């Protein structure tokens, strides 16, 4: 496997590094955002099915559960505690093998349990009995296990199920780190213990204009945890101070932090929710409409439009190549001296082994004083090593060592 000659192209990228561009935009949709809920459920279902397939049959059977729709409900929030009038509707769809050698495999049971388990962790104030309806319409499939094993023996490296590409880059910019870590901290167990009123639907938008950063945070506040507007304003202040701490640990640039800017106290308008997610109030969510595999939405960077969440971790290059591109880029940025920025794009060809992409493009912006000539060989070797060991990604996914949104 290591002896293969792969089509890896390492070249210099001539463009202004993101940190030197005048305007940079960065977004993260928090785990309670409707789009992130869809991503999280889709991925939780895929991982649960994969683990159960391995447990029963020793191999991950074919499935894709990347079609999850969150249909917003209707709620009446009020200080001290409101109510959900119309529950959120969540549709699980896609495909999964349900018959194995005439033996029934409980796809829907596993999928529903995985979805509920995920929601319990992701949206703490969501009452699964009254606030949400989960409907599994995952399509059925059947398989001859002997045929599956014979195919796996013949092709130890899975064959790409699509002609598609993945994209990754490194390192993160200052603004990207701030946006990512602000949401992660506000949704951390540590912060929630101190401020249980802060819901999980937290969206962070970063704008850097020159050397000044604007950080806009929209955070759903749980109505049962705040009795009045004064309580609400105290929680907003806590969010502001927490974000300020993150910002100050990452940059010396002047930064403006804004929290829940749509509030209008004079009109009695506050961002309060019953559940901690705007999905209760008609906001819908879909897989792939939110964060990329590095957890961010970054219009200043190359991005793939593929939805990674819910795709099978064996042969679906829409998932595997996006993760792989990110890992290769991270290693090149960390291990190769003289790299200012690196962008990785990997293209598959349907039916070909996933360790032999049609092309693996590595584009490097060298640091001042460094030539691309001295960066090409180590960058090539890192990309080649990851491709030679591409099946490790499947294991990393099942062990929850990589995220996809």
UniProtKB/Swiss-Prot annotation:
Which reaction equations make up its catalytic activity? L-methionine + ATP + H2O = S-adenosyl-L-methionine + phosphate + diphosphate
- Give the protein family: Belongs to the AdoMet synthase 2 family.
Q: What is its EC number?
A: 2.5.1.6
Pathway(s) this gene product operates in, as recorded in its UniProt entry: Amino-acid biosynthesis; S-adenosyl-L-methionine biosynthesis; S-adenosyl-L-methionine from L-methionine: step 1/1
Reply yes or no: does the keyword Magnesium apply.
Answer: yes
Instruction: List the protein's name.
Output: S-adenosylmethionine synthase
Matching PANTHER family, A to Z? S-ADENOSYLMETHIONINE SYNTHASE (PTHR36697:SF1)
Record keywords: ATP-binding, Magnesium, Nucleotide-binding, One-carbon metabolism, Transferase
Q: Which GO terms describe its molecular function?
A: ATP binding; magnesium ion binding; methionine adenosyltransferase activity
State the Gene Ontology BP annotations.
Answer: one-carbon metabolic process; S-adenosylmethionine biosynthetic process
Q: Which residues bind ATP?
A: 139-144
Q: Name one Pfam family in it.
A: AdoMet_Synthase
Cofactor dependence: Mg(2+)
Enumerate the HAMAP family for this protein.
Answer: S_AdoMet_synth2 (MF_00136)
Q: Does the keyword Magnesium apply?
A: yes
Organism, by scientific name, is: Thermococcus kodakarensis (strain ATCC BAA-918 / JCM 12380 / KOD1) (Pyrococcus kodakaraensis (strain KOD1))
Q: Which InterPro entries match?
A: AdoMet_synthase_2_family (IPR027790), AdoMet_synthase_3 (IPR042544), S-AdoMet_synthetase_arc (IPR002795)
Biological role? Catalyzes the formation of S-adenosylmethionine from methionine and ATP.
Query: Its gene?
Result: mat
């Amino acid at each position: 496997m290591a002896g293969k000659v792969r089509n890896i192209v390492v070249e210099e990228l001539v463009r202004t590094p993101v940190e030197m561009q005048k305007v940079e935009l960065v977004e993260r949709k928090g785990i309670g955002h409707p789009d992130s809920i869809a991503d999280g459920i889709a991925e939780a279902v895929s991982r649960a099915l994969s683990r159960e397939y391995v447990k029963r049959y020793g191999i991950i059977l074919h499935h894709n559960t990347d079609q999850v729709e969150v249909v917003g409900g209707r709620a009446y929030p009020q200080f001290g505690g409101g109510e959900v009038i119309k529950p959120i509707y969540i549709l699980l769809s896609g495909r999964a093998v349900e018959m194995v050698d005439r033996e029934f495999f409980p796809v829907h049971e596993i999928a529903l349990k995985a979805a509920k388990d995920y929601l319990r962790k992701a949206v703490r104030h969501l009452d699964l009995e009254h606030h949400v309806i989960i409907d599994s319409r995952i399509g059925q499939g059947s398989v001859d296990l002997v045929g599956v094993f014979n195919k796996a023996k013949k092709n130890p490296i899975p064959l790409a199920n699509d002609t598609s590409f993945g994209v990754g880059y490194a390192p993160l910019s200052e603004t990207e780190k701030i946006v990512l870590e602000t949401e992660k901290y506000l949704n951390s167990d540590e912060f929630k213990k101190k401020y249980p009123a802060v819901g999980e639907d937290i969206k962070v938008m970063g704008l850097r204009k020159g050397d000044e950063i604007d950080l806009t945070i929209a955070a759903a506040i749980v109505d049962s945890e705040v009795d009045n507007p004064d309580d609400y304003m105290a929680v907003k202040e806590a969010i502001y101070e927490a974000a300020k701490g993150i910002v100050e640990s990452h940059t010396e640039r002047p930064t403006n932090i804004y929290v829940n800017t749509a509030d209008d106290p004079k009109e009695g308008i506050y961002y309060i929710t019953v559940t901690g997610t705007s999905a209760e109030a008609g906001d819908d969510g879909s897989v792939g409409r939110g964060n990329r595999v590095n957890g961010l939405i970054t219009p200043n960077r190359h991005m793939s439009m593929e939805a990674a969440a819910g795709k099978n971790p064996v042969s679906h290059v829409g998932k595997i190549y996006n993760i792989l591109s990110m890992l290769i880029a991270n290693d090149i940025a960390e291990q190769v001296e003289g790299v200012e920025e690196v962008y990785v794009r990997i293209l598959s060809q349907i039916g070909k082994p996933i360790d032999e992409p049609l092309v693996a493009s590595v584009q490097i912006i060298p640091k001042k004083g460094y030539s691309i000539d001295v960066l090409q060989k180590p960058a090539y070797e890192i990309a080649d090593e990851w491709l030679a060991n591409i099946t490790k990604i499947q294991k990393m996914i099942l062990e929850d060592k990589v995220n996809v949104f």
